[in-house]
């Protein structure tokens, strides 16, 4: 058998395994969880507003991927889908974007963004928890395919679209502003590249299987996490906030 044909068969077999197993979302969850722990540790050692928000955002990413792994391995249900939709489709990118706001925007504006994010998190959580879920949408799912967005009713889709759009805008805008100002050029270039890779991963599912999404997310997460870690190591130009003295 020619080498090219043998390699094609191996690649096809590997893709078939990835398409029918929970390995891709599980590995994605582990990577996101490790990055979240790393960011939380950095926040504990040297606090900055962006760090805990990034840690929470990465933890939400891990929760969504873990729910997808569970749904793939044991079958999707109402609970696993709600967790997947809430943490992945609604909250994750918005919280990451709120963290980036503290690096790119004036502190007063970033605090407003933070307050709006908290309000949106509460609204989205309540909406997703009480929204009706069409269990019939889970019947024909195969491999790592996730349930369609139409499986959940109410106004959940509005929260998902709005929070994802604003969060992505904050992540991209924050990186671009810093690049233009030549502030933390390397870290912000990595953050921007990671966001683009994760976004493109969803687009590439049109040309390949759902496993393409998770493989793209793995790469994007590593690049995004590296950029965040790099930015934190470079430090912040702002002066530390003085402690509150209680008389």
Where are these regions (language model features)?
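Short aromatic-rich membrane-water interface segments that cap or initiate transmembrane helices
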Residues: 15-21, 79-90, 145-163
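First transmembrane helix
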Residues: 17-45, 166-178
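Individual alpha-helical transmembrane segments in multi-pass integral membrane proteins
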Residues: 19-32, 48-125, 214-222
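C-terminal transmembrane-bundle signature of multipass membrane proteins
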Residues: 34, 173-247
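Alpha-helical transmembrane segments of multipass membrane proteins
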Residues: 40, 65-69, 199-203
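Membrane-proximal helix-loop-helix units in multi-pass membrane proteins
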Residues: 104-169
């Amino acid at each position: 058998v020619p080498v090219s044909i043998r390699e094609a068969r191996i690649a096809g077999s590997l893709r078939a395994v990835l398409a029918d197993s929970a390995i891709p979302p599980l590995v994605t969850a582990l990577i996101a969880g490790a990055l979240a722990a790393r960011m939380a540790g950095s926040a504990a050692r040297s606090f900055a507003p962006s760090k805990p928000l990034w840690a929470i955002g990465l933890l939400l990413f891990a929760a969504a991927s873990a729910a997808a792994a569970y749904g793939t391995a044991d079958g999707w249900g109402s609970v696993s889908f709600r967790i997947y939709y809430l943490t992945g489709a609604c909250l994750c990118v918005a919280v990451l974007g709120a963290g980036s706001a503290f690096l790119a925007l004036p502190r007063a504006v970033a605090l407003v963004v933070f307050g709006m994010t908290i309000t949106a998190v509460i609204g989205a959580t309540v909406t997703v928890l009480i929204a009706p879920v069409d269990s019939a949408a889970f019947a024909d799912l195969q491999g790592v395919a996730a349930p369609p967005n139409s499986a959940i009713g109410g106004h959940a889709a509005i929260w998902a679209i709005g929070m994802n759009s604003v969060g992505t805008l904050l992540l991209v805008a924050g990186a671009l502003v810093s690049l233009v100002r030549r502030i933390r050029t390397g870290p912000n270039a990595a953050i921007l590249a990671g966001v683009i890779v994760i976004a493109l991963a969803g687009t590439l599912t049109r040309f390949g299987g759902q496993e393409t999404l998770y493989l793209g997310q793995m790469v994007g997460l590593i690049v995004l996490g590296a950029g965040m870690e790099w930015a934190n190591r470079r430090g912040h130009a702002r002066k530390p906030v003085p402690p509150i003295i209680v008389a």
